[in-house]
């Protein structure tokens, strides 16, 4: 995912945590906050060390990024933070995709109807 689509700064994460809205399911928590002037979404991913070793955490992050790449054109321009919860570590990429799509639909972050 290109740099323009990333949230990296701790101050940006903290601002979204404080002022953003959250939606969750068993596997993921989504924090979102609108931002004036954004033409596309920006994504931050947080996977705790409690979920496993670096290999496991990176696999989860890759699956999350891939899901957002697939839906890049379908997303509303928002700042989005995805936090992985413990059940996500045992999921396949397809299960992660379905779970993320579910929580994104609940959060109403798609700009059109996704099957």
UniProtKB/Swiss-Prot annotation:
Its EC number(s): 3.1.26.5
One term of GO molecular function: 3'-tRNA processing endoribonuclease activity
Keyword Nuclease on entry: yes
Record's keyword annotation contains Hydrolase: yes
One GO term describing the cellular component: ribonuclease P complex
Domain of life: Bacteria
Reactions catalysed according to its record: Endonucleolytic cleavage of RNA, removing 5'-extranucleotides from tRNA precursor
Keywords of this entry: Endonuclease, Hydrolase, Nuclease, RNA-binding, tRNA processing
One BP term from GO: tRNA 5'-leader removal
Function description: RNaseP catalyzes the removal of the 5'-leader sequence from pre-tRNA to produce the mature 5'-terminus. It can also cleave other RNA substrates such as 4.5S RNA. The protein component plays an auxiliary but essential role in vivo by binding to the 5'-leader sequence and broadening the substrate specificity of the ribozyme.
Family recorded in the similarity comment: Belongs to the RnpA family.
Subunit relationships: Consists of a catalytic RNA component (M1 or rnpB) and a protein subunit.
UniProt name for this protein: Ribonuclease P protein component
Species whose genome carries this gene: Staphylococcus carnosus (strain TM300)
Name of the coding gene: rnpA
